[in-house]
Amino acid sequence: MKDLGFNTLRKHIKLEPERFYYDCDRYGMIVFQDLVNSGPYHYLRDTAIPTIGGKLATYHEAPSERRRNFFLIHGEETLRHLYNHPCIVLYTLFNEGWGQHDTQNLYRHFRAMDPSRIWNAASGWFKNSDSDVQSEHIYFGSLRMKAQGRRPLLLTEFGGYSCALEGHRFNLDEEYGYQKYRSREEFQGAL
């Protein structure tokens, strides 16, 4: 990845095998690590409407006590498991509202558990007052962002562009992307 010019990877709502973090430590790759979300996801509420700048709600229904406990215990175990990996410089609690609940209290709890890392309470939208950074996702329109307050501003997701190249496709029947390009030149020009 470094040979391609990348110095940071975001592990999006999943954990990797130990070897991944070891190699990132060894080669100096920065990791933004999401906690694994456990909660309801609604495409319209959590993705479609916020992507174009709207919101149906700023708070989500509280998950069951079992789900809340699972998120808390799994998050604590994740922090203990990954604590000695210096490649991880930032943790994200919730992505785009997926399973988001009790954000301020959870931010304070996990930040107290590991104050050595930067904490992103909500990546994308449904932001809270408690977070070390302001995280934005931009898929349509220009990549213009405006800081709110004094927190660092991060663009943590963008683009969604695709170009189906022969010999570089996993699924030959479907192509995913918000904006699709038919040639390498057209694709590179859009970036």
Question: How would you label these PLM feature ranges?
Answer:
Residues T8-L191:
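Substrate-binding/catalytic cleft of secreted carbohydrate-active enzymes
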Residues M1-K2, Y22:
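N-terminal carbohydrate-binding accessory modules
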Residues G5:
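Phosphate-binding active sites in nucleotide-utilizing proteins
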